[in-house]
Amino acid sequence: MSAATTSFPNRPAAWDLPSRGKVAMAGLIIAESAIFTIFVVAYLFYLGKSITGPTPREVLETPIFYTICLLSSSLTIHFAAKCLARSITFAFLGLWLLTITLGGLFLYGTAQEWHRLIYEHGLTISTNLFGTTYYSLVGLHAFHVTAGLIMLAIVAVFGLAGRVSVKQSGRIEVLSMYWHFVDAVWVVVFTVVYLLGR
């Protein structure tokens, strides 16, 4: 008499809930998206309604190079997080520092543009409606880039001290979510201000 074999149905794979850090960052991104939406709508609403100049067409130059720098930083931080998850800490640190460099170049480009607009064209936040909405929208984004760079720099300091390992890969992934958000917002700002707005 042969022993009967019992077959069991395939059990569904366990469903892992996202970490609290990812949930919190997702909530922050949703809230920040609402704020940026208000600023973008305000920019579009007041576009072309300035009584006095200068106008966007007269003074704005398309920051293609600095845009490429910022968008490229999304790739570098993505691969940096992947390297850390695989315990390739040397590559992680190199890509992380490259991300900071690219973000810093973008901020430099923003500062350079503001200097030109203020001192060559006399455009300040109180000059006209365009100045008010332009500096508010672009400044809001620059503030978020600055905040992101500060957080990236803190991680870099710990990384150079040898205190970042695969154990922190989850936190690094959460931080990369914020940086991807900042880059995605710039695509919208760039399109509205430098393409549609001109």
Q: For the regions a protein language model found, what residue spans apply to each?
A:
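...captures the hydrophobic TM-helix bundle architecture rather than a specific catalytic motif
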Residues: 1-198
